[in-house]
């Protein structure tokens, strides 16, 4: 890629190779490229549910995926979407089988498409008997620090030191700043309450059905993943890029919801949860469309429906 532009050189080699292959297969029509890629990713996402023993409530989980992740990740953050899919469909299932070498291989493969996949290596500790009380305390602690902006200063200091030690170029520093400081006035993104509101139903599930979840290896694995995911969100909630980096662990939501649909104590409880969460997802998806399309020529069409 000697003659490639700066933007292409800044992409991971796996994504560049895949895009180049699609270019030779389909030509320069970007819509066909998106159609093929997203069809492939949706099929693999469905496979990932099966491979992770998620067999109940599949239609609702697909609705969850479409409303919560599809518009953003499968179009705007396509590289990370590919990496997330690789982690979900191959890496996590191999870890559940305790095949750690294969797990690490697929994490590295995912990182070739988007380097944030390396954070999924944290899953290596999620199959252990973690002390959930300490994790909850850590969540509360970092939540307070994030609200008071203390975590912001610490993370920026660490990043600056790391870049200094690595001798990174100014271009990388500018790109990183663009990811971290997302508002127009150069401030941190700030707290997104929806991130934590959507976690409330799952907090109920892991607390109410704790004994059943921890009675199986896979239940303990995804319960631990959920708590660590919330901890990471509490740490990174003021940094949009870092928050998105943690989304590999949102897969725990899919498992927990499928588990709940299957094990709900009553039909009324199941229906109430489905009603509340369905309405939340509808509001979330409409809000997201509003944010991204309101100022474009498509806004009239979208909101006229």
Q: Where do the protein language model's features map onto the residues?
A:
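Short acidic/glycine- and proline-prone juxtamembrane loop motifs at membrane-interface regions
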Residues: 74-81
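Membrane-interface alpha helices of multi-pass inner-membrane proteins
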Residues: 102-126, 230
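Short hydrophobic/aromatic helix or loop-helix immediately within or flanking a transmembrane segment
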Residues: 2-28
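Membrane-interface transmembrane helices that cradle and orient dolichyl/undecaprenyl
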Residues: 84-102
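Transmembrane-helix signature of polytopic, membrane-embedded enzymes
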Residues: 49-66
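Signature aromatic-anchored transmembrane alpha helix within multi-pass, membrane-resident enzymes
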Residues: 139-140, 265-287
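Alpha-helical transmembrane segments and terminal signal-anchor/GPI-anchor hydrophobic tails
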Residues: 16, 123-245, 292-305
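Transmembrane-helix motifs of polytopic, lipid-linked glycan transferases
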Residues: 36-52
């Amino acid at each position: 890629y000697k003659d490639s532009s700066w933007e292409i050189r800044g992409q991971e080699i796996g994504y560049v190779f895949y895009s180049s292959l699609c270019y030779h297969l389909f030509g320069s029509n970007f819509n066909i490229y998106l159609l093929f890629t997203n069809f492939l990713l949706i099929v693999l996402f469905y496979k990932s549910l099966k491979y992770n023993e998620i067999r109940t409530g599949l239609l609702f989980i697909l609705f969850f995926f479409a409303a919560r992740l599809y518009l953003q990740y499968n179009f705007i953050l396509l590289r990370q979407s590919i990496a997330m899919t690789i982690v979900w469909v191959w890496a996590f299932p191999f870890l559940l089988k305790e095949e750690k070498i294969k797990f690490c291989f697929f994490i590295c493969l995912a990182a070739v498409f988007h380097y944030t996949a390396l954070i999924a290596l944290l899953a290596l500790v999620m199959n252990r008997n973690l002390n959930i009380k300490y994790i909850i305390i850590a969540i509360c602690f970092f939540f307070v620090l994030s609200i008071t902006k203390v975590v912001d200063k610490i993370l920026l200091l660490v990043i600056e030191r790391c870049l200094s030690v690595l001798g990174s170029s100014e271009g990388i520093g500018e790109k990183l700043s663009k990811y971290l400081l997302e508002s127009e006035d150069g401030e941190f993104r700030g707290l997104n309450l929806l991130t934590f509101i959507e976690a409330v139903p799952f907090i109920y599930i892991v607390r109410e059905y704790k004994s059943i979840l921890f009675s199986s290896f896979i239940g303990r694995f995804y319960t631990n993943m959920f708590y660590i995911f919330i901890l990471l969100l509490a740490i990174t909630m003021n940094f949009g890029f870092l928050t998105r980096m943690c989304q590999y662990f949102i897969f725990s939501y899919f498992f927990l919801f499928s588990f709940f649909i299957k094990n709900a104590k009553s039909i009324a409880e199941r229906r109430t949860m489905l009603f509340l969460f369905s309405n939340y997802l509808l509001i979330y998806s409409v809000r997201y469309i509003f944010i991204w399309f309101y100022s474009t020529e498509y806004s009239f069409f979208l909101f006229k429906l």
